């Protein structure tokens, strides 16, 4: 992948990305570091070329295998809520296209990302490699189990909704750490922030949302 591919042109140009950043500001995204990344990380390389003309719309798009790339507002909101610091270790449950992965990896020291659909893993790795992001480990696995051998984590982000928060993810959250996750069924979900302190866990409910379900187990495709 060439530098020109990363920079984009026309509907993937920097001007188009800047317009997206402006819309994110209008919708309440205030973290300047997150906004800068939303304007600089090339979303168009994380989707099929047939959809590249829509890469900087605030909409979700298909990435194959019944999965989608999240809309930019959701990516920015989740990243802002996680409040990642440069020296922290983060777990992402659901690599998908790798777009949210790239944003998080640009914010933290080490990122560990799990994807249940095996066919998506090499695609994400190729795209992340093109961006020369070297602080990421991606593997095929069950997100419900987390990645205990690399925990505890300062931040855990789950861009899919389990009916209840998996116990393993709570156990892998470090003291001082934060978990951001939508919780609920297809009919009703709430976006939650879980913080672990020396005294235990605190839960903050933010708003009603609608995410794809977090599916247990693994799959080839």
Predicted features along the sequence, with ranges:
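Active-site/binding-pocket entry motifs
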Residues: 44, 53, 62, 200, ...
């Amino acid at each position: 992948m060439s530098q020109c591919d990363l920079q984009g042109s026309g509907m993937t140009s920097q001007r188009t990305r800047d317009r997206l950043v402006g819309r994110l500001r209008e919708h309440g995204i205030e973290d300047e570091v997150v906004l800068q990344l939303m304007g600089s990380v090339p979303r168009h390389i994380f989707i099929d070329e047939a959809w590249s003309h829509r890469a900087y719309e605030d909409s979700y798009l298909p990435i194959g295998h019944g999965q989608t790339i999240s809309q930019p507002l959701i990516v920015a909101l989740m990243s802002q809520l996680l409040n990642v610091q440069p020296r922290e270790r983060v777990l992402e449950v659901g690599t998908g296209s790798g777009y949210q992965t790239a944003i998080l990896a640009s914010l933290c020291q080490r990122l560990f990302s799990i994807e249940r659909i095996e066919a998506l893993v090499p695609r994400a790795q190729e795209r992340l490699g093109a961006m020369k992001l070297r602080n990421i480990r991606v593997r095929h696995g069950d997100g419900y189990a987390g990645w205990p051998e690399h925990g505890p984590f300062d931040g855990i982000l789950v861009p899919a909704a389990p009916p209840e928060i998996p116990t393993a993810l709570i156990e892998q959250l470090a003291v001082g750490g934060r978990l951001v996750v939508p919780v609920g069924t297809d009919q009703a979900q709430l976006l939650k922030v879980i913080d672990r302190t020396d005294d235990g866990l605190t839960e903050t409910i933010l708003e009603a949302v609608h995410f794809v379900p977090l599916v247990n187990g693994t799959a080839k495709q």
